[in-house]
Amino acid sequence: MSDSNNISSLYPPPPPYVKFFTKDNLERLAEYQSSHVTTDPEQITCELDFLIPPPVPSAGHYRAFGSVWQVKDELPDLETVGLRNLYDDRGQHGNNYQYKIKELHKLLKSLLLNMLELVSVLSVNPERFPDKVEHIRTILFNIHHLLNEYRPHQSRESLIMLLEEQLEHKKEEIANIHAICDKVQAKLAAMCKQYIADD
């Protein structure tokens, strides 16, 4: 068997600096942090520096679990990815979601039309289908991009609906509690009247 067919371990081995996390080092850490002033938190001067967590990245990117992640999660433009933008989004950034919904409807109609055209091209001249398939692909990428731009609004609306449902549920519970309290008070008042009448 070749070395390339070997199964790698399910979990990666622990980093080498894990051996510095001993009980003695943890006890010395507070004293070390108070006496030692660091100008560069990335610089390692002794084994206790491994116990101090690195600063949270504020810009650019970072590496975690073998992947590179952007600090600010932004949706790239279609042009930067190398695709043609089929809708006009100049001046439409931000919270103009009605515009995005209208553009989605336009793209869906265009997709249906192109699917019909693809069927007709396949029935008449099957060799000409790659251009139509590429156009459908571009439309689908544009729809996908618009849907991704719409996700923050959808999340906010879903959260609002969830909170409104919880509020209605709490109001119903409070109304039920008040009704039960009224019944208990009426029952106690009736018992008091009966007790006074018996005396």
Curated annotation (Swiss-Prot):
Belongs to the Mediator complex subunit 7 family. The lineage of its organism: Eukaryota, Fungi, Dikarya, Ascomycota, Saccharomycotina. GO terms for biological process: negative regulation of transcription by RNA polymerase II; positive regulation of transcription elongation by RNA polymerase II; positive regulation of transcription initiation by RNA polymerase II; regulation of transcription by RNA polymerase II; RNA polymerase II preinitiation complex assembly. Gene3D superfamilies: 6.10.140.1520, 6.10.140.200. It comes from Eremothecium gossypii (strain ATCC 10895 / CBS 109.51 / FGSC 9923 / NRRL Y-1056) (Yeast). Its main location: nucleus. Disulfide bonds: none annotated. SUPFAM superfamilies: Mediator hinge subcomplex-like. This is Mediator of RNA polymerase II transcription subunit 7.
